[in-house]
């Protein structure tokens, strides 16, 4: 069986060979665990963002960055595809593990989840778990973890601390922006699973999503990076069997659709649980049904809200 941790660990080792070029910095802690700073105290880079995203997806995706325009304004876009969508997206990339140790907090994603089974029901659903002796986790945080945090992760994954790698990037960073846009296929797979579609029926997924400009703080950046997916992210999916429920996947089916996410979050008194979960989805999907040969298109792109979120200033 494929080991997302073993494949991802090879990518991390490649990153460590090119720290200066990638503008990242690694540190071996006293317990042997390796922390890779991808944007906390270093600038990071687009290439680091690509590799970070590949690590998050357990090495089971191809990720690149291209430049395209939205209403004649140039933007960088993440493009990606995976032929193992359930494992790469739900079994690895999904930010399904909240890391809380003393005062340290981070959203954990990546292959280590498949060892710790966070959350267990996800792995029962996709019928997958990893049994590697190395664990690779990606932490969305503005602080680097210490030995105690890495010890906790190692224990949950049932591996030795010296066999744990943690990639760390804040939301408001180059790598942060890239890796969140790199979740565009995952948001589609996640939503499909949430509304009752069997993720094991998804054969492949390919997506494209603009990379948010880096905003002034993590809170604003959280808004703009989510808006990248919700208002301009598009996904092409190949499935064994189409289902009418898939028309409910795009973000425009949400009652909260139509405003920048930061405004929605602020109106909800910064309480995620007050926001309609249907909002967290791609703007548009196209679904190719292998049973009939038809391709069904749902959703729409919305440059107007995206430009508000990105704080775009156009010449008069």
Swiss-Prot record:
Temperature dependence: Optimum temperature is 85 degrees Celsius. Requires a high salt concentration for optimal thermostability at 90 degrees Celsius.
EC class: hydrolase
One Pfam family, short name: MCH
Tagged with keyword Hydrolase: yes
GO CC aspect terms: cytoplasm
Subcellular location: Cytoplasm
Keywords of the record: Cytoplasm, Hydrolase, One-carbon metabolism
GO terms under biological process: lactate metabolic process; one-carbon metabolic process
Enzyme Commission number(s): 3.5.4.27
Subunit relationships: Homodimer.
NCBIfam families in UniProt: one_C_mch (TIGR03120)
Job of this protein: Catalyzes the hydrolysis of methenyl-H(4)MPT(+) to 5-formyl-H(4)MPT.
Designated name of the protein: Methenyltetrahydromethanopterin cyclohydrolase
């Amino acid at each position: 069986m494929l080991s997302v941790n073993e494949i991802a660990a090879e990518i991390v080792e490649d990153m460590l060979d090119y720290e200066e070029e990638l503008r990242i910095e690694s540190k071996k802690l006293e317990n042997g665990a390796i922390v890779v700073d991808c944007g906390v105290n270093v600038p990071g880079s687009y290439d680091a963002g690509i590799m970070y995203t590949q690590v998050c997806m357990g090495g089971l995706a191809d990720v690149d960055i291209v430049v395209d325009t939205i209403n004649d304004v140039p933007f960088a876009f993440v493009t990606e595809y995976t032929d193992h969508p359930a494992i790469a997206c739900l079994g690895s990339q999904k930010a399904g593990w909240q890391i809380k140790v003393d005062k340290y907090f981070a959203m954990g994603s990546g292959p280590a989840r498949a060892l710790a089974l966070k959350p267990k029901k996800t792995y029962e659903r996709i019928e997958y778990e990893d049994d590697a002796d190395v664990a690779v986790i990606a932490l969305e945080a503005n602080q680097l973890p210490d030995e105690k945090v890495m010890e906790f992760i190692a224990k949950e994954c049932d591996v030795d601390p010296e066999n744990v790698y943690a990639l760390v990037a804040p939301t408001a960073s180059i790598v942060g922006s890239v890796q969140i846009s790199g979740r565009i296929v995952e948001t589609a797979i996640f939503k499909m699973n949430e509304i009752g579609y069997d993720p094991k029926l998804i054969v492949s997924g390919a997506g494209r999503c603009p990379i948010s400009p880096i905003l002034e703080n993590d809170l604003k950046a959280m808004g703009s990076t989510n808006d990248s997916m919700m208002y301009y992210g598009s996904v092409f999916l190949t499935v064994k069997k189409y289902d009418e429920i898939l028309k409910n996947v795009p973000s425009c089916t949400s009652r909260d659709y139509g405003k920048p996410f930061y405004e929605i979050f602020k109106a909800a008194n910064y309480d995620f649980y007050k926001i309609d979960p249907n909002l967290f989805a791609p703007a548009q999907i196209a679904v190719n049904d292998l049973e009939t040969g038809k391709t069904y298109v749902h959703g729409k792109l919305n440059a107007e809200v995206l430009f508000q979120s990105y704080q775009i200033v156009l010449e008069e």
